[in-house]
Regions:
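ALDH superfamily catalytic-core signature
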Residues: 55, 90-174
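Rossmann-like NAD(P) dinucleotide-binding subdomain of oxidoreductase/dehydrogenase enzymes
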Residues: 1-126
Length: 174
């Protein structure tokens, strides 16, 4: 165990991301402090209640309701041993700068733009289905959603035709 770990978590998976940070942190013998995205504070309060009502040690998990502008002061606090952030590149740069200035252990999981690569020997039906589900997961609000398609020329027309057909079956919006 290294002590108290600050987790700065995004809004797009407000429960899953927090538990993905908190459970391993606590299991390893550390305390967890959450600074959640400001638009999902209700989720953060509910998660803190889950830990409390489940019989975890008192204060093993705490939720900070603070603006993003105050995060650097929390990182600098001597009680914080490490910080982890899942978020945007600009937020990650800010956290890295502050954490680096006081030599805190740091994990940066920052915004991605995952490519989806379709090669000549791909099972196109499977590729189209997995590409669509990957892109539409959580209404597309995911850093791991397939955002760029790289398709070899030999299968491009078939892939595109199948993709258009399958997407036309989806209901978008209200």
């Amino acid at each position: 165990p290294i002590g108290l770990i600050l987790g700065i978590m995004p809004w797009n998976f407000p429960f899953w991301q927090v538990f993905r940070f908190a459970i391993p942190t606590i299991t390893a013998g550390n305390g967890a402090i959450l600074k959640h995205a400001s638009n999902v504070q209700g989720c953060a309060v509910a998660i803190e209640s889950c830990f409390r009502e489940s019989g975890f040690p008192r204060n093993i998990f705490r939720n900070l309701v603070i603006p993003g502008s105050d995060v650097s002061e929390v990182i600098k606090n001597s009680a914080i041993a490490a910080v982890t952030i899942t978020g945007s590149t600009p937020a990650g740069k800010s956290v890295a700068k502050t954490a680096g200035s006081v030599l805190k252990k740091t994990v940066l999981e920052l915004g991605g733009s995952d490519p989806y690569i379709i090669l000549d020997d791909a099972n196109l039906s499977l590729a189209v289905d997995s590409c669509i589900s990957g892109r539409l997961l959580n209404a597309g609000q995911s850093c791991i959603a397939a955002k760029r398609l790289i398709v070899t020329e030999s299968v491009y027309d078939s892939f595109l035709s199948m993709m258009v057909e399958k997407l036309s079956e989806k209901i978008m919006g209200n």
